[in-house]
Design a protein with these regions (language model features):
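Catalytic cores of large soluble enzymes that bind and process phosphate-bearing ligands
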Residues: 1-4, 19, 48, 151, ...
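Residue-level signal for alpha-helical context at structural boundaries
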Residues: 30, 49, 78, 181-182, ...
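Glycine-rich phosphate-binding loops that contact phosphosugars or nucleotide phosphates
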Residues: 39-171
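Internal, active-site/partner-interface "lid" segment
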Residues: 128, 142-143, 168-198
Length: 198
């Protein structure tokens, strides 16, 4: 069993190492620019990528930074209304060929929205549509069929959380900002110098 986890860590390490540095730095910069110009960062995904996007949004919001989740499926049923002029959209899709993802990519392009595709596929319909891409490598998903969203979602989580931390730094977020937004639970108590049960 331990061997399985060691193999997973090797896969994740190799995948994270495949992050294209130039594109990553440009993406971070454009996220910061969007926030500084009154825009917001929108993370969009479907299926098992939904909680990954929501975690990123939650981390951003806890720092007082404007981020929203846009479900790839419901976007074209009115939710596109949240996308404004100065926003940036992070579109998560492992294969990039899901009909909903391709459809949303097309509509975002028509609107002139700054869109980034975070994908593990270099050749996909979405990649043909979206100009800005961060293409990642993934050896396998870690299950016996190499089909379940497992390692890919872990990589997305690592990358998006890393992005949130870096964006927070560049936006000058201080611990006091986080403290104001997170008064509850053990974290809130710790920030107030209190014991949770006192």
């Amino acid at each position: 069993m331990i061997t399985y986890y060691e193999n997973v860590m090797d896969v994740l390490r190799e995948s994270v190492s495949s992050i294209p540095v130039e594109e990553y730095e440009r993406l971070i910069g454009e996220c910061v620019d969007a926030l500084q110009n009154g825009g917001k960062i929108i993370a969009s995904g479907l299926g098992k990528n939904v909680p990954i996007c929501e975690k990123f949004v939650g981390t951003m919001n806890s720092m007082g930074l404007d981020a929203r989740f846009l479900h790839t499926n419901t976007a074209v049923h009115g939710d596109l209304g949240m996308v404004m002029k100065n926003d940036i959209v992070l579109l998560l899709s492992k294969g990039g060929n899901t009909i909903e993802t391709v459809t949303l990519a097309n509509y975002l392009k028509e609107r002139g929205t700054n869109t980034w595709l975070l994908t593990f596929s270099k050749n996909s319909k979405s990649a043909e549509i979206v100009d800005n891409k961060m293409e990642l490598f993934l050896e396998n998903e870690g299950d016996e069929w190499d089909i379940m969203p497992n390692n890919s979602t872990s990589v997305y989580l690592i990358i998006l959380q890393g992005m949130a931390v870096e964006i927070g730094k560049r936006m000058g977020v201080q611990l006091e900002d986080f403290k104001v937004n997170h008064p509850g639970g053990g974290i809130g108590a710790k920030l107030r110098g209190e014991n949770l049960w006192n």
